Amino acid sequence: MSLADRWITLFNKPIPNVILRLVVLFGGFLSMAMSIALMRTTGLGNSPISCIPATLSYLVPLTLGTITFIMNTCFLIVQAILLRRDFNPVQLLQIPFTFVFALMIDQLLPFCETLPMQYYPEQLGWNILGCFLLAMGVFLQVKASFITLPGEGIVLAIAKAAKKPFPKCKIAFDSSMVVVSVAISFIGLGYLQGV
């Protein structure tokens, strides 16, 4: 068996223990929160799902984590509306998990603001690390196979309600998040910020 085959086998194995799955899930949340905090601090761009909270955080007296929590709660409400009777009440667990995730973002932002980011190469390096951490966080969240955050849950609900493939819905959803963020930025600030 080649090394690549061993890695594929390892990553495709389900995690059997609930406690271990929760640890992996929270590791994913921590990685994603660090990613959001890093990308916000560099000022070079955010992930599509974080664009709206990042832009709004320059306009309203709320933290990035608080805005993220509010937006994700709205996403959960939309999931319930789209799925109607197919909405599983266990999905309400997304609320406390999102609260913890939002809290992580707010706790990591002050740390990220202390990192050296005076020059473009430093900013670029931190932003690339942020992209890697985001990918790692999403991987760990999926690997935990426990619960998704509302940002992914809403896309799953849209795909199911529209009877469209998830990848197409994800691209359309992410694109719409960026477009809305750009509009908010130009209308509210007069220039591009947080996208």
Model-assigned labels for residue ranges:
Residues M1-V195:
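Core subunits and conserved enzymes of cellular information-processing
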